[in-house]
């Protein structure tokens, strides 16, 4: 409501928008890989086929998104935490703690993947946990409905 808005909360809204765009970039990479038949979900849906042939431009885009994934991931986590700090943690809406846990979950297992000093088994397990598309879907759904509940 307008009476609760402050200068900090106005900036926090914009930070949340930038975080949303970071998630769009992260999941654009996932979507492109699924469409190209890379990943276990697409192999189950389309055995031995791909929807799109592998054009050079798409490969270049995926290569860029692969190289920058870690940076967009770190930025997304930092922006979400900053957004929460600036807007306030609304624990009365149970969706928000769930979003926070899922975002930190993704960040933690993403960090385990890139940390070279961990044993291979731990890195493989971390990859399997981090690569679950359902976590990203959960973040999106819970964040959306949490914001809907706050706007009422």
Q: What feature does the model see in each segment?
A:
Residues 1-152:
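Membrane-embedded alpha-helical bundles that constitute the cytochrome b-like, heme-associated redox core
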């Amino acid at each position: 409501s307008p009476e609760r808005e402050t200068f900090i909360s106005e900036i926090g809204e914009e930070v949340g928008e930038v975080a949303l765009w970071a998630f769009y970039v992260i999941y654009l990479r996932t979507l492109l890989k699924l469409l190209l038949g890379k990943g276990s979900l697409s192999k189950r849906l389309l055995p031995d086929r791909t929807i799109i042939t592998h054009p050079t431009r798409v490969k270049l885009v995926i290569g860029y998104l692969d190289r920058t994934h870690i940076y967009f991931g770190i930025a997304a986590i930092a922006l979400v935490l900053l957004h929460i700090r600036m807007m306030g943690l609304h624990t009365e809406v149970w969706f928000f703690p769930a979003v926070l846990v899922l975002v930190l979950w993704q960040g933690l297992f993403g960090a385990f993947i890139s940390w070279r000093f961990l044993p291979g088994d731990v890195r493989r397990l971390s990859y399997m946990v981090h690569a679950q598309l359902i976590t990203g879907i959960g973040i999106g759904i819970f964040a959306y409905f949490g914001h809907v509940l706050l706007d009422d």
